[in-house]
UniProtKB/Swiss-Prot annotation:
<protein>
    <recommendedName>
        <fullName>Large ribosomal subunit protein uL14m</fullName>
    </recommendedName>
</protein>
<comment type="subunit">
    <text>Component of the mitochondrial large ribosomal subunit (mt-LSU). Mature N.crassa 74S mitochondrial ribosomes consist of a small (37S) and a large (54S) subunit. The 37S small subunit contains a 16S ribosomal RNA (16S mt-rRNA) and 32 different proteins. The 54S large subunit contains a 23S rRNA (23S mt-rRNA) and 42 different proteins.</text>
</comment>
<dbReference type="GO" id="GO:0003735">
    <property type="term" value="F:structural constituent of ribosome"/>
</dbReference>
<dbReference type="GO" id="GO:0006412">
    <property type="term" value="P:translation"/>
</dbReference>
<keyword id="KW-0687">Ribonucleoprotein</keyword>
<keyword id="KW-0496">Mitochondrion</keyword>
<dbReference type="InterPro" id="IPR000218">
    <property type="entry name" value="Ribosomal_uL14"/>
</dbReference>
<dbReference type="InterPro" id="IPR036853">
    <property type="entry name" value="Ribosomal_uL14_sf"/>
</dbReference>
<dbReference type="GO" id="GO:0070180">
    <property type="term" value="F:large ribosomal subunit rRNA binding"/>
</dbReference>
<comment type="function">
    <text>Component of the mitochondrial ribosome (mitoribosome), a dedicated translation machinery responsible for the synthesis of mitochondrial genome-encoded proteins, including at least some of the essential transmembrane subunits of the mitochondrial respiratory chain. The mitoribosomes are attached to the mitochondrial inner membrane and translation products are cotranslationally integrated into the membrane.</text>
</comment>
<dbReference type="Pfam" id="PF00238">
    <property type="entry name" value="Ribosomal_L14"/>
</dbReference>
<dbReference type="InterPro" id="IPR019972">
    <property type="entry name" value="Ribosomal_uL14_CS"/>
</dbReference>
<dbReference type="GO" id="GO:0005762">
    <property type="term" value="C:mitochondrial large ribosomal subunit"/>
</dbReference>
<keyword id="KW-0689">Ribosomal protein</keyword>
<dbReference type="InterPro" id="IPR005745">
    <property type="entry name" value="Ribosomal_uL14_bac-type"/>
</dbReference>
<comment type="similarity">
    <text>Belongs to the universal ribosomal protein uL14 family.</text>
</comment>
Length: 131
């Protein structure tokens, strides 16, 4: 369950490492796997002082940016139709643009199969594994 102020890992190569949930899109209080949220980038990936100029040119987002995202993993248990229960070690998301296309070109780590039911096929095709 993702709600306001929840911190999530960003698992794509868009340049964000840690994001904070600012809003759940739609008339819902909590977001689960496959739901769209609005996030604020809290920490940038690879933004060290030595390579700041090189890394800032390669990143697509920077700290403080407000972006849309899709939740791909949650620590909250999710019950599936076949009776199995899945639970991940962290809360994670993938940044998307307003049209729903992923900002990054690669996804690191597993994503939940619930994305298939909610029609996020582009994210599923980029992910190395589904759980």
């Amino acid at each position: 369950m993702i709600q306001l102020k929840t911190m999530l890992n960003c698992i794509d190569n868009s340049g964000a490492a840690l994001v904070e949930c600012a809003m759940v899109v739609g008339q819902k209080r909590h977001a689960s796997i496959g739901d769209r949220i609005v996030v604020v980038v809290q920490k940038q990936r690879g933004a060290d002082s030595a390579g700041m100029a090189a890394s800032s040119a390669a990143t697509k987002v920077k700290r403080g940016d407000i972006r849309h995202a899709v939740v791909v993993r949650t620590k909250q248990k999710v019950q599936r139709r076949d009776g199995s229960v899945v639970r991940f070690d962290d809360n994670a998301c993938v940044l998307i643009n307003k049209a729903g296309d992923p900002i990054g070109s690669r996804i690191n780590g597993v994503v939940g199969q619930e994305l298939r039911k909610k029609k996020w096929s582009k994210i599923l095709s980029m992910a190395p594994m589904q759980a």
